[in-house]
């Protein structure tokens, strides 16, 4: 098939990762090597599990920090250089700013762990049904500016971007090519995560928009 890179998702029933530790990465790395594959991007499950970047309760906050820290270390041992993340979602019964402040704090701490492990964090936006604090480009820019760490970057998710009514060009104009290091590149309408042709996006134009802005990251 010509596939050379994989974005591994640490989630049941694939890879075991929690706030206490993670499975032995050596057999996984050996399988990748045996098949001529690399894992440039590592994604700890952060949507369907209880771990999130803007957790409120002190115990949960620390468990989330340990979980994502373990994800950074796990990814590093598999040869990844990017940890995929999202903004976190805050709580629906509190002001947006409260969840936002916790997300900033979490990413500042995790960015230090990433730096120690030669990893970058790539943060995507979510949909308005998923997050109060990170579904629009201005919110992600605010988060990016407040975290203010060289190991904290952003990524484009075509579905979240489409739902928000944004464009690829807006993202490059807002963040600059050097700060967009990854992409979730799927068809949508505007919701959904579809194979290309099942949604209404223009594949050729989207690729051209990415490449014409100097994008050199992966498409997953």
Task: Describe these PLM feature segments.
Residues 1-2, 29, 33, 79-81, ...:
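Histidine-acidic metal/acid-base catalytic patches
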Residues 51-153, 163:
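Active-site acidic/histidine proton-transfer and metal-coordination neighborhood
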Residues 15, 54-59, 195-197:
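Short glycine-enriched, charge-decorated loop/helix-capping segments at active-site entrances
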Residues 10-12, 45-48, 87-91, 125-129, ...:
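Active-site-proximal loop/turn and secondary-structure-junction residues that shape catalytic pockets
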Residues 7-33, 87-94, 194:
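Glycine-rich, proline-tolerant flexible connector loops at the mouths of alpha/beta enzymes
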Residues 14-16, 48, 93, 131, ...:
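Active-site-proximal flexible loops/turns
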Residues 19-38, 66-77, 104-112, 167-177, ...:
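Short amphipathic alpha-helices and their capping/turn segments at secondary-structure boundaries
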């Amino acid at each position: 098939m010509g596939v050379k890179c994989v974005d591994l998702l640490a989630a049941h029933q694939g890879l075991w990762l929690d706030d206490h530790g993670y499975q032995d990465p050596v057999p996984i790395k050996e399988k990748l090597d045996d098949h001529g594959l690399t894992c440039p991007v590592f994604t700890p499950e952060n949507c369907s599990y209880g771990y999130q970047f803007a957790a409120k309760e002190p115990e949960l906050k620390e468990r989330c920090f340990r979980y994502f820290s373990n994800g950074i270390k796990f990814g590093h041992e598999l040869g990844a250089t990017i940890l995929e993340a999202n903004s976190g979602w805050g709580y629906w019964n509190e002001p947006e700013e409260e969840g936002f402040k916790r997300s900033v704090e979490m990413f500042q701490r995790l960015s230090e762990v990433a730096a120690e492990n030669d990893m970058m964090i790539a943060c995507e936006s979510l949909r308005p049904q998923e997050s109060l604090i990170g579904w629009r480009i201005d919110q992600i820019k605010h988060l990016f500016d407040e975290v203010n760490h060289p190991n904290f970057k952003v990524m484009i998710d075509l579905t979240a971007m489409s739902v928000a009514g944004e464009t690829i060009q807006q993202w490059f104009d807002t963040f600059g090519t050097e700060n967009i290091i990854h992409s979730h590149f799927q068809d949508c309408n505007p919701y959904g995560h579809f194979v290309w042709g099942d949604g209404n996006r223009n594949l050729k134009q989207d690729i051209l928009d990415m490449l014409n802005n100097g994008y050199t990251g992966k498409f997953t």
